[in-house]
Amino acid sequence: MKILFYRYNSICEPDVIQAFKELGHSVCEIREEMTNKAVTPSECVHLVSNALEKTNSNIVFSINFYPAISEVCNIYHLPYVCWIVDSPVMELYTKSITNPWNRVFLFDNTLYQEFAPLNPDCIYYLPLATNVKAKQQVIKQAKKSGYVMPDVSNPDSIKKLCQYKSDIAFIGSLYTEKNPYDSLRNTSDFFNGYMDGLIEAQLKVYGYYFVQEALTENIIEEFKQCMPDFYTQPQGSYITDRATIAQYYIGNKIAAVERQRMLSLLSEKYDVDLYTGSDTSSLPHIHNRGFAKTLTEMPIIFHEAKINLNMTAKPIRTGIPQRIWDVFGSEGFLISNYQSEIPEYFVPGEDIVLYDSPETLMEQTDYYLHHENERKEIAHNAFEKTLEYHTYEKRVELILSLIQTSP
């Protein structure tokens, strides 16, 4: 099969491309958006149309959903296959989601339940995956040499393996720099009290995101009036103002509050290494290690940490985020917040440790920092299960089998 792959530099792209190739398929890449984030929908249409004329591809593939690509494939009568790996992806709410040549795979079952009725024969549920082989190769090389080269093109970037050891490691944004909620202006006292209470209530609940249901019409109207440049979709979009506020604005705000609180709490008692580009001035006890290279450093960080921490952003309502799969593929030990889909694939206490409150997280952290054998056994269990069932090769095989048998 010939696959035209539209890229924008998602961390998932190289692994999916490798899986396609290892299964014997050829891949032609459109790379313009990897370096030019100002590509317009019309330019996207032009890029894809030109590539289709030249490559004679059987399908077009992308990570996340591009309405422009969907429209092109609808004209060409060619399957447009995309795998949604983030949330929210606002483009899903456009009218293009109903096109009959779409084959959309959603990693979050709640998202699937939301969108499947709009295009029942063309939307699927598919969890994320990881590239176990690549991660183990990086770890094996580092252990053999005792060194890590984050930038393979720069020999001066070399570091000792021991520099990656951590008691507790967290890789990710604090969401403070991508939190549009804080742009609200001139809100009423009632609004402020309502929103503060709603955010605090949601912070106490794991496994169910109720913010969208709790927004009143008056709160929605005041939010729109007090938010400069309120996000609006094109005419005919399926998203409501309620969903936009709950997922795009409040979800990111809750993620920012939760991550800062949890990391502050942990770092006051334990050594916590944070790999991030976010401002950590509000976390004086954190060890800010800067950005981590996805391919060359993250697997080693996950493997060498005594405890890896996952805090799923609230817009991911029930699904398993990419971070969990990548920790497991690196044979790392993980403590994560509870997500309702996790027990469908992994056994709590055997493959993963789940917390449902700050108090539980502190107790689990203290226990597992002092029980190395249990950590290693749990990490190995998750690794073996991931290797057998949750690699990109397995997922890509399933994608291709489903699109070949679909109407």
Please describe what each predicted stretch is.
Residues 3-5, 50-65:
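Short N-terminal targeting/anchoring amphipathic segment
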Residues 35-52:
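N-terminal beta-loop-helix "entrance" segment that forms/cooperates
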Residues 47, 69, 92-93, 296-297, ...:
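Short acidic active-site motifs
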Residues 52-58, 68-80:
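Glycosyltransferases and closely related glycan-assembly transferases
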Residues 73-88, 103-106, 128, 169:
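Active-site proximal beta-strand in glycosyltransferases
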